[in-house]
Amino acid sequence: MTLEEELSRIGCISKSGVRVQNLAHLLNKETLKQCFHELDGSKAVGINKVTKAEYGKELDKNLDKLVSRLKGGTYFPRPSKRVYIDKPGTNKKRPLGMSCFEDKLIERAINKILVAVYEPKFLDYSYGFRPNRNCHMAISRLLSNIRGRTSFVVEADIRSCFDTIDHDKLISFLERDIADRRFIEIIRRELKAGHLEGNIYVDDLTGTVQGSGASPTLANVYLHYVLDTWFDDMRRRLGPEQRFRGVAGLVRYADDFVGTFQYEEDALKFYKELEVRFAEFGFTLAEEKTRVIEFGRFAQANLDERRRLGLTDKTQPDTFDFLGFTFYCAKARETGRFCVKVKSIGKRMQRKLNQIVAWIKKNRHSKLEVIWQHLNRVLKGYFNYYAVSGNSPSVSIFRYKIIRALFKWLNRRSQRKSYNWKGFNQMLESYPIADAHIRVDIYNYRR
């Protein structure tokens, strides 16, 4: 039986509700060799500085030794190397763990198995780090929820989610679904491996290592039980145990999530009980980023009424941010009816623009081919994500400002190489800049 057939079998067992057994035997030479060929050899190395190429020189011998240690219970992952990278959209740094290459093989194999076990169990609220799901699907689902009976939104943020996952509680969640002590023990050792901060060893008392091959799925398992199933239970209860009076929805992408509610009392109840629920499992809500707002088809009318009564000076309903976009209430141009629109978060767009302009300034003396290749690679990636329905003004302005910056800095190279706008536009015909046409219809997105 191939690995894919084994994983498919595991998925069927898991879907039936039976605890899955005999998983550790899949951490065999064949699986690890497949993981070896799948891993990117250009990634940073761990504390032992062994590269993929070096490990592969004696691949069979190395894998035989590794499998022997796994079977004998003597495999212990090395501490990861802690580095800090820029956190997208902010000025903050995000910790990242660099595992040794051999440990990356185990992490990747474990992740394959965990995905097979949990994909049949994960609920439809969850979109992050799952096969055949992405950010645009999460956004589309959220838009659909809001276009329904939503009148209130809970925008929430978990403070340092990945760093505060309780190891013992995570293991207990895994044991609900997996009846293989050896496999669970390997995961426990991965969690407890610690990391090096410079040359200083630090115990990992909580959290999953960001950068580990299994970390996203382990975090999804934790949030599945802490948030998703808990919310689903609240939403489905009827009769005397009914928790929500009206329609309620949830969309989660990794640790970012938004709750949508028909009634304010339900939104406030969810917010209040969420704090208690999270505290039980080691999570804390970032109060400055967590709030209940009125949002939906009646938000503008209700705001206008409060303004008429002199209760507020606001003219527009509150907005909220999710996955790089600002969501706001609007009216459809053709019908005048309520609709929800999205636009690029202003601060993030400006920060990205500043990065690109700084690159243009620094590299203005490079060959035009080099400049254009880099810019188009960056812009295509940016537009593939942000060029969605309704966001044409933001991405068009972004592109326009890049072109203006190009004109400015190419004219600073030398008098001999300077352009007027006519000459510059002629040059753009030979070296076109990626256009900002809409790539994704998020109102009718299908996976």
Locate predicted features.
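Charged, compositionally biased N-terminal leader segments and the immediate start
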Residues: 1-25, 30
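Core structural elements
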Residues: 27-30, 79-81, 88-89, 191-195, ...
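Extended, charge-enriched "interface" segments that sit outside catalytic cores
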Residues: 3-5, 59, 76-78
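Conserved polymerase palm-domain catalytic core
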Residues: 69-70, 75-84, 121-133, 137-295
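A terminal-accessory region detector
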Residues: 392-447
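A conserved non-catalytic segment of reverse transcriptases
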Residues: 192, 198, 285-365
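Short, charged alpha-helical motifs in flexible N/C-terminal segments and linkers
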Residues: 36-39, 43-51
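Short, solvent-exposed helix-loop connector elements
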Residues: 95, 203-208, 338-341, 357-371, ...
